[in-house]
Amino acid sequence: MHYLPKVYYDFLEEEGLYCPDGFPAPEWDEAWQQEAMTELCISYALLSISSPSVFTGNKFRSRELARKINEEGAQIVSHAPGNLGFLATLPLPLVHSSIFEARYCLDELHADGVGLMTNYGGVYLGDRRLDELMAELDGRGALTVMHPTQPAVMVPDVNEEIPLPAFEYFVETTRAFLNMAQNDTFTLYPNIRWVVPHMGAFLSILADRFESFALMLRFADSDRRADIMEDMAHAYYDAAGFSEQKQLEMLLRNVDESHLFYGSDTPYTDITACVGQAEALEQTAKLTDAQKQKLFTGNALALLPKLKERIHA
């Protein structure tokens, strides 16, 4: 679930981002969060910032924003520690500042993990300039949740009436994942627990095609060939969005059921739509009852062992 603390609202207003990525920023506060969780029967939620990221081009301002958002996130979690956790926001592409912020959030604020956008000013996940941060997260076995954002390059006068989440987000997620595969991110940093949004976007559709090209193409001037199937199997996936009808079945051909999680995408997806999406997953014939239990509860408890203690504290 996403959250919009006051400092983030202020940032959007200061930057004139009244309709970021084609959608107006939704209303959110702690009371709304608890009401939404009750209506959706969610007992524990990880809060994260959605797109856009906090990088403004001003290094000091970006570091300050990330710190204020994270401290406000920790404060919000402290009001309901048995029901809420949060993912750290990092001031990328400032790598050293992001390492410092990740350490502070994970060690002092007790964040459950970090949230990373697919790109930061054109620096995509998988870029070797991020290696020092990846090494830090790998050493901690950090839960790291990917989130799409505006592509680094937008084609003018094309699909202008279509909000970015409808199409470009899926392209962004797929592009970032393939860049990570091509640059060995999953192999070099195997302990990072990556969560890919929206059932992997276009990955299941393109996996066979990319795999066939990988057999012919060498990457990074070496004999190494990317193994997209292995990398897909390594990652975890949330079921946010309209994923049941086609994506679920396709993803399960490549990914073990233990790597799937429920995700709501509130408040950017309204409660009515979230209820419908959750019901579709609950009623689907594509999953057994045991698989549904894993999707909604069991897999999260396995990935976050401390979660069981918090819920029953």
Protein language model features and the residues they cover:
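Short, glycine/charged-enriched secondary-structure capping and boundary segments
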Residues: F11-E13, F60-S62, E101-A102, R128-L130, ...
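Active-site gating/metal-coordination segments in enzymes
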Residues: I49-N179, N183
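Mid-to-C-terminal alpha-helical segments outside catalytic/metal-binding sites
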Residues: H2-Y44, E71-H79, F100-Y104, D112, ...
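Active-site gating loops and adjacent loop-to-helix segments of metal-dependent hydrolytic enzymes
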Residues: H2-W28, N58, A152-T173, F210-H234
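Hydrophobic faces of well-ordered beta-strands that scaffold small-molecule active sites
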Residues: M1, A45-L47, G85-T89, V114-L116, ...
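Acidic-and-aromatic substrate-binding clefts and catalytic sites of carbohydrate-active enzymes
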Residues: F23-W28, V54-F55, L92-S98, G121-R128, ...
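H/E-rich (His + Asp/Glu) clusters that bind or coordinate divalent metals
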Residues: I162-A181, R193, P197-A313
